Amino acid sequence: MVWMRSAIVAVALGVTVAAVAAACWLPQLHRHVAHPNHPLTTSVGSEFVINTDHGHLVDNSMPPCPERLATAVLPRSATPVLLPDVVAAAPGMTAALTDPVAPAARGPPAAQGSVRTGQDLLTRFCLARR
C-alpha cells in the first residue's frame, strides 16, 4: 500500500508541474504583448489614444510569467535569533532523549492503597443505606 500512496503523490506532483509549465512556457494562441496598466486619468493628456488591439482579459491574453518570486516586505532582522531558539528547544530535546519508562523492580507488584473484599463493600453499602 505504501507504493500506491507514493505513486499517487508522484502523479499529483507531475500534474502540478505540468500545469505550471503549460501556463507559463508553452506557446499560447493569439497572445498579445503585455502592456503596463493605464495611467491615471489625472495624468492623461491629449496624447492618450485608445488602442483596440492590445490584450485584455476578455481577449484571453496573459501577462508574462514573473522572472522571480515576490520578496519579503519586512526588512531582515539584525538581532541574533539562534540563542532564543536553542533555549526554547533545549527542554524538548532533553525530554526526547530521556527514557520515559521506569525500570521494573524484582518481586510481586506493589499493593494498591485501599483494597477491600466483597464482604467489606457490602457491609459498607448496607451501613450507608441505614
Swiss-Prot record:
Lipidation (S-diacylglycerol cysteine): 24
Membrane topology: Lipid-anchor
Signal peptide: 1-23
Entry's Gene Ontology cellular component terms: plasma membrane
Keyword Ligase appears in the UniProt entry: no
Location(s), subcellular: Cell membrane
Domain of life: Bacteria
Mutant phenotype after disruption: Deletion mutant shows reduced growth in Sauton's minimal media and is highly sensitive to SDS and copper when grown on solid media. Reduced growth in acidic media (pH 5.5) and under hypoxic conditions, with decreased survival in hypoxia. In vitro, the mutant is attenuated for growth in PMA-activated THP-1 (human) cells. Mutant is extremely resistant to copper and shows increased growth in vivo. In vivo infected guinea pigs exhibited a considerably attenuated infection, and a few animals cleared the infection.
Keyword Signal: yes
Annotated GO biological process: response to copper ion
Protein name: Lipoprotein LpqS
Taxonomic placement: Bacteria, Bacillati, Actinomycetota, Actinomycetes, Mycobacteriales
